Every structure is written in structure tokens, then in C-alpha cells.
Amino acid sequence: MSTFLRRITFLALTIVLCAPFAIESALGQLPQPKAPAPKTAPDPLDRGTPDGTIFGFLEAAQSGNYAIAAQYLQMSPARRQTNGEALAQKLKTVMDIAFAGNLKPSREPEGTPQEGVPGDRQKLGTMSSGDVEADLELVRVSDANAGKIWLIASDTLTKVPEL
């Protein structure tokens, strides 16, 4: 056998014998599929969509259940405990009197993209009284029990007492 044929045969055998190890080594370096994120329980207040949040707030407030209505507001637990019900009642009154907008919020958990509004926010309209004006905005936040939920934004709530 010629030297050239021996070299070709040796090269072919080397490739055939080493290929399984090279493939196994390469596969071991590929990223492994991530385990699915743990499922969170559905939010009992239906705050998973902008639609569920605003109509849940209005339903609770209209029935006079301001403790539940306060759960739709972006505020600390301590502030919710001391001021939540009063602020929910005031917000409902302001919305009844001073809201201007098209109350057709998104039914999608991610909301609907709006020009000039960050992706984690939804602008529903404006409330105005005299020279004071405030956007009615929702913000998407993380909740330890329910995952991502929508709340009436703290930016909106800070303006409510002035309206």
C-alpha cells in the first residue's frame, strides 16, 4: 500500500473513531433547556390584565368595599393599611366626576403598546379639576403570589388629593 493510501486510511479511521467523542463533547457544551418557571396562582382579584384591574377596582369601590378597592392601588402595605380605603374612595369619586378618556383597557396580560408610554404602563385617560390634571395610569408589577399584576400607578395616586 502506498504511503498516500495509508495516510488517507489512517485519517479516515481517526475521523470515524473520534467523531462520536467530538459530537458528545460538543453536545455537552450546548446550553441545556431551562426548567419552566414555577407557576403562580391566578390573582384572586383578577389584576392580571389592565381590564381586570380597572373594572375590579370600580366594582369594589361602587359596592362600597374600599378595603378590597385599595388592593388595586400601588402603595406599600403600611400605607394601604392606614390610607388605602380613604384613597380608594377619593379616587372613585374623582373618576366619577373628573375622568376623561376611553375606558377600554387591554384584556391582554402584557397590555397594549401605547406611543410614549413605557411597556409596563397603560394610560387609560386623564382626570382634571381646575388647573390640576393627572393621568389615570396602570403599572405592571411583580407580586409574590400572583406573578405579574396591574395596579393603579402611584404617580396617579399622588395627584388624587389635589383633584
Predicted regions and their residues:
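Soluble extramembrane regions of membrane proteins in the secretory/endomembrane system
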Residues: 25-163
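Bacterial N-terminal signal peptides
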Residues: 10-22
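N-terminal secretory signal peptides that target proteins for export/translocation
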Residues: 1-6
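Positively charged, low-complexity intrinsically disordered regions
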Residues: 7-8, 18, 30-33
